[in-house]
Structures are given as structure tokens and as C-alpha cells.
Amino acid sequence: MKVARFQKIPNGENETMIPVLTSKKASELPVSEVASILQADLQNGLNKCEVSHRRAFHGWNEFDISEDEPLWKKYISQFKNPLIMLLLASAVISVLMHQFDDAVSITVAILIVVTVAFVQEYRSEKSLEELSKLVPPECHCVREGKLEHTLARDLVPGDTVCLSVGDRVPADLRLFEAVDLSIDESSLTGETTPCSKVTAPQPAATNGDLASRSNIAFMGTLVRCGKAKGVVIGTGENSEFGEVFKMMQAEEAPKTPLQKSMDLLGKQLSFYSFGIIGIIMLVGWLLGKDILEMFTISVSLAVAAIPEGLPIVVTVTLALGVMRMVKKRAIVKKLPIVETLGCCNVICSDKTGTLTKNEMTVTHIFTSDGLHAEVTGVGYNQFGEVIVDGDVVHGFYNPAVSRIVEAGCVCNDAVIRNNTLMGKPTEGALIALAMKMGLDGLQQDYIRKAEYPFSSEQKWMAVKCVHRTQQDRPEICFMKGAYEQVIKYCTTYQSKGQTLTLTQQQRDVQQEKARMGSAGLRVLALASGPELGQLTFLGLVGIIDPPRTGVKEAVTTLIASGVSIKMITGDSQETAIAIASRLGLYSKTSQSVSGEEIDAMDVQQLSQIVPKVAVFYRASPRHKMKIIKSLQKNGSVVAMTGDGVNDAVALKAADIGVAMGQTGTDVCKEAADMILVDDDFQTIMSAIEEGKGIYNNIKNFVRFQLSTSIAALTLISLATLMNFPNPLNAMQILWINIIMDGPPAQSLGVEPVDKDVIRKPPRNWKDSILTKNLILKILVSSIIIVCGTLFVFWRELRDNVITPRDTTMTFTCFVFFDMFNALSSRSQTKSVFEIGLCSNKMFCYAVLGSIMGQLLVIYFPPLQKVFQTESLSILDLLFLLGLTSSVCIVAEIIKKVERSREKIQKHVSSTSSSFLEV
């Protein structure tokens, strides 16, 4: 491996080498050698001239998020949809055939579709920009011997940066000063435990992964404790953060299932359209008709058969779904993504910050005399209670518990202000515990005389203190740390107010510790006494990163609906399985796989075992990518949730990337398709429900539009091919076309989401939107409409002379069939009475408006002239209503039969299961 990468100044005379160190190499070298390679002055920093000089070659300390495309290009890109291309071709053919009405209506439809899609994507991008501007990155940097407060984007390799508690690390740093420094690297590595940092060089054999480089502070990570200085070794895309970003940009986002379905439908419609042209031309030629005339008729029919309203309904339905998701605090960046969630059958979720809060919390206390206390409440606040045997403990009411809380509070460097932690998460959990008991003031009651800071080697921390009001008394020593280390300094333990010699109790406590550990708790032992080596063992506290509120319920519902959830984390196997079990993700039959085991397998091997795996632990971004690829290889539609830099590449590779809006990094949000503004995992369940509902609405529209379209096409084709008089004139056909693509059709796209839809299994993305069942329903409706309309035409045409009354009856019959067909198309499974006749107000208004329009066409004299109609009697209208309602009645009967069949199948299935159990 090269020590450094050099870039040349493209100037003839003053060629200078500008070095860039990798974090792995920098961690192996002494600080002095790193400074020499970077040509850096660690104490005084760089001068402004040198900073400008280096920036000319390294660029700004930021990421090149793909250059903004001009708005006109973004608008033009919306025309790439196959259905839009087909409609454009239809418009051109309509112009060539002098059918200007069709050409105008199709062009307007196209413009509406692309404009709605363009505006929605533009608004989502702007929302994302505003979200990413909430926290402007700044840092403290030494330049020309002075400490400056500057923007992180100004940093260059060789700059000296100062870090303190609460700071975000602005670039990759090689540390040369560190005092009790702990950094939370969970956003980068997935590790929930803050990493203790040192300055000594590391052997090459021990720094293979990012988490093991203890002398490097990585860009984007958070200082939890201590202070430090470091020299910048990598900025922007040359940082480890940047490596993830480059991987993310290189990953292509897959097409959504809806896009695939619409592509397939576009191809099918094209195929059928050309088929119609060919068949009609062939039949006409065989009948001896003029070939050019037959071509004109067949092209007109093919253009009429293409449902130009489909892209509008799809776009508007998706846009309304996106707007509903915004109300639920979710930003969807691209329209089709919300529907994609409807066929999502696997969710790969990062644990830290997504399933859990990333806020360590004390949940159990075990005193040295065997008393067990449960602690409620989550996070760094005072909300919660300490309960012993059903009673709430407060203050010094229970001395055994209070002593443990006192030791944890005094032997502590963390501070909680306004529910925000300044310090280590584990120490924050102890302060929050003290707040719940009203004892957090104890931290200020003691004066610290000496301190033994925590280190990863000794695994304990101790302080020597005196009480402010009793400074003449001997010092008291408080200790906390790993049980096996703390117990070495203890000689006694407390039992019911008495101090006893530590004997068999040690083994009992060890067993208790093991039991707590098996539950995935991080265990801390606490002790106090006059001197180290003469301490009294007080007891244990169990700490956990708790699950987010409502996650367990959401997980249960999703699993019941056929969605598999897999937890991916950088934590240990024990902790990962404990959290997964609490959430209902892990059972006795589940498997867990480590990152090392994933490395030993290729994608093909992993794809064979991945369906049975519930937990992936010690996983890196590379492993997450492999997991997602193996799931996609099995044909799964994968959603990936996450909030850290380590999730970004997988978020982009997944079919749906879901980022957390509050805790998520900018890189993570850039990679995601959807952002949960409130970080609420339950919103994913709402999105899946929304996605399934949207797809159902699109199917409802397709059923209505194609059945009406096929009926109209068949009616006109039969009349043309069999030399019958045309039952409808041109203006009447235009009016039917307006209804077919107009308000009644559009209103089907805004049908309220059926609450039962979440219980249905995810649909197979390979299935066409035109399923066998849907095609059957379309054909049945079309046949009823054609037969009914032809019957009315035949009934009125008994004198073999076409009169305005004949066409008016036929025309009105077809329109009424249309309305009843739309009514039955509102749901594919439920009766219109079950979903509610007026539950979709827009549909009611649309149908009412269409009927009023039809009555005006029949009875309003000026329109009678335009449409060549005449007034009908009340009896005529009642006859037509009775006849045309048949399409709705038959559809309702089919639904009833299907529901009955489904109930019988469920009953047989449950009976078989019960029999097998017996």
C-alpha cells in the first residue's frame, strides 16, 4: 500500500506535491511522520496562503452531489415513460389522420401528466434541501497560531482541528492530543458503544476495519466525552465518509415495480393496438373494401383504444399518496416509490437509531443483597419510575437502591441539559436514573479530590470525593465499571443495612450478571468505600439501547401481513438477538449470521440461507450491500431503513431506501427514496398501506377504462366490419371518450385506502397489472355493455331507419352503462354498500356531474343540435337505468362468489392445520 497519494500542480515552474494520507496508513505512522508527510505545523497550523494553495488541488471539504440539471432537462426527462411515448405517437397519428380533437385531448393529457410529475419531484427535492440545511457544519481550527471558528468546508489536509464534547468531527483526523476522548461512531460503523481514542501508532495487523483505528477521528462522528487535537488527513471524497458517498453514487437505483408494470402495460397496449390495425385491415381487404379507407378506420380505432387517461390517473393517484404521506411526516422524493412499498416483502432495518433510540437507558437494578428494581421511561430525561416489589422508590426511601444511584451519579462526567446529553451515553443513562429518583443534585453535593479515568484496558472509573457540607470528614471513593474488575477492589457488601464480608455472594451476583447479560443488557457494577481495595460492593445496573415506541406493534403487523423484517447491526450477537427478540423479530427457529460469515460466502450462497436469517450482526456497509443483492437475487422487493453513513450505499441499492430525518446524515438522506421526518418506524407501515391502496386504485381505474374502451371499440368495430349503420355519431363518441377519461374515471384514483389492505400479502412485482382475474372482469363488463347497447340499438331500429331517437337511446344506454361500471369498479373485492356509496365524495360529484351533463345533451335544445339527440320520456330513462344496472349487479355477484370461495378456502386451511396439530 502506498504511504500517500500525490497530486501535481499543473504549472510549469512551481510544481508542488500535495499529499493525501489514507486513514489506515495514518494510523500506523507516528504523529511526527504524519506531520512531515502532510507538511503540517501541528501547533501553529497552516498559513492562509498555504490553505488557499492546497484548496486549489483538494477542493472544498464537501461532496459533489451531482450537478443540478437545468429545469427544462428535468421536465423533458418526464417524457421517457413508454406510455407517454405511445400517447405522443397516437397524437401524431391523429394529426396525420386529421382527427384534431383526439390530438388536442391526448396532448393535453400528456402535458398534465408530465407537469404533475415534474412539480412533485421538484418540490420533494426542495424539501430535502431545506432538511439538509438545518445543521450548518462548523469547527474550531488552528491557523497562523490562532484558534479560529470556521466552516468545516474550508478545511484542507494539514489543518489542525480542536475537538470538544458535542462536536461533529469535520474531517478525517490523525489525533496527536487526546484527553479522556470517546467518540460515537455509530453513524459510520454501526457500533453503539463510543470508541475510546488514543494517539499512539497502531500495528498494521490490528487496524483492518474502521472501528479498530483508535487514533483516527472520522468525519461525521460525534465527540461524546473529552477533548482532542488532530491533523486533517482526508477531506471531502478523500475521507472514509466520502468513500461511502462514492460507493453510493456508483450504485444504480433499480426501477420501481409500478414503472415495470406500466412499461409492460404500454407494450401490451401497443401490441394490441397494432393487432387491431392488422386484423381490421385484413378483414376489410378480404371483404373487398378500399385498403386506404380501412387503414384510416383501423388507426382511428387503435388510437381510441389507448387509454390516455391512465398516465394522468397514475400520476395524480401517486401525487395524492405522496401528499397524504407528507401529512404523516414522510417526504417521498419520487412519485412511484410510495406504490413500490405496496409490494415490498422484505425490510432490512439498521438497529441503532432506527429500531432503537440510540439513547442508553437503565432498565434494571440489582442490589448486593438481592433486591431487584425495574426502571421505566426511555431516554435522557426525568420521565420514568424506579419500582421495587410494585412500589415506586423515590429519593432515599430505599437505601440499598439509593446508594447505587448515588455512586453512579457522583462517579460520572456526563451532563444532561434540556433532555440533551453532553458526555458518554452510558454515563448519561446513570444521570437519567438519578433524575427519575430526584437524586441528580448529588453530583453537585460532592467535591472531587481525585479521579481515576476510565480506560478500555482497566474497564473501570473511580473518583475520590468529600461532601460539600462535611469537608472535615474522610474522603469517600466511588467506583463503577465491569463487574469482573470492580469486584477485585471490594472486600465487603451491603445486606439489609449491614456490611458483610464478600464470600458466596460474589458467585450469586455473578449468576445475576450472567442472566442480565443474556438479556442483552450492558452491565455496570458499582461500589463505594474509604479506599480502593477496601470498597463495599453495592450492586449492578443493567443498561440497554431501548426499542423505539411503537416499533414492536408495527413489526407485528408487518410480519402478519407477509413482510419479512431483518435487523442489520454492527453490535455483538448477544445484544442484537436480545433487541430482535424484544421486537418479535427473532424466534427459536430464526438464524443469525455475522459479518465474517457473510465474507466467507458469495451472493449465490448467501441467497440460499438469507430467507431464514432474522439478524445480521457485526455488519459493515459492504455486508449490507451483499445482503440486499442476495435478497434481490431471490426476487424480493427490499426496503432498507437507516440513519447513518454506513447505510447510504445500501439505501440506494435497495428498491426503497428509507432514511431518518432527524438523526439521519446528509449522505443517508441523499441516498434514500423516502425520509421519515419524525424518525417513526410506524410510518413505514402507513406507507405500505398507502402503496397497496394506490395500486388497488390504479387497478380499479384500469378495469373501468379498459372495459369501457373495449366495449366502445367492439361496438364501432362490429358496425364497421358488418356494414351496419353506425350506432353512434362522432360527437357522441367524443362525449363518451370524455367520460371514459374524465371525472368519473379520475375519481377512482382517489378512492380512500381500504384499512383491510395492510393484512393482504405483498403483491408479486413480476405480475402484470392485467391479472387473469382482472382480465376476466374486464371482459365480462365489456360483453354486458356491448350486448346491452346492441340490444337497445336493435330494439329501436325495427323500422331499419336510423332516427335521432335511436341514437339517443343507444348513446344514453352506453353512458349509463359507463356510470354503473364505474360504480362497480370502486373495489375489486368489496361490495359498493360495504365500502359506502358516498365514502368517495369526489366520485359522487363526478358521476352526478356526468349524469347532469348527459341530461343536458338530451334535453337542452342547443346541445340537441350539436349531438343530434332528442328528448326521452321518464319511462325510457327508467328502462335504461334498469338495463344498465345489470353490469353492476353481475359484478357484485362475482365479488360475492369470490368472497365466499375465499372464506371456504380459509376454513379448509385452518381445519387442516388444526387436524395436523392434533
Curated annotation (Swiss-Prot):
Group of enzyme by EC: translocase
Annotated Mg(2+) binding sites: 643, 647
Molecular-function annotations in GO: ATP binding; ATP hydrolysis activity; calcium ion binding; manganese ion binding; P-type calcium transporter activity; P-type manganese transporter activity
Extracellular side: 97-98, 289-302, 725-732, 795-842, 895-918
Presence of keyword Transferase: no
One Pfam assignment: Cation_ATPase_N
Keyword list, A-Z: ATP-binding, Calcium, Calcium transport, Golgi apparatus, Ion transport, Magnesium, Membrane, Metal-binding, Nucleotide-binding, Translocase, Transmembrane, Transmembrane helix, Transport
Cytoplasmic side: 1-75, 120-267, 324-703, 754-773, 864-873
Subunit structure: Monomer. Homodimer.
Function in brief: ATP-driven pump that supplies the Golgi apparatus with Ca(2+) and Mn(2+) ions, both essential cofactors for processing and trafficking of newly synthesized proteins in the secretory pathway. Within a catalytic cycle, acquires Ca(2+) or Mn(2+) ions on the cytoplasmic side of the membrane and delivers them to the lumenal side. The transfer of ions across the membrane is coupled to ATP hydrolysis and is associated with a transient phosphorylation that shifts the pump conformation from inward-facing to outward-facing state.
Record-given protein name: Calcium-transporting ATPase type 2C member 1
Gene name as annotated: ATP2C1
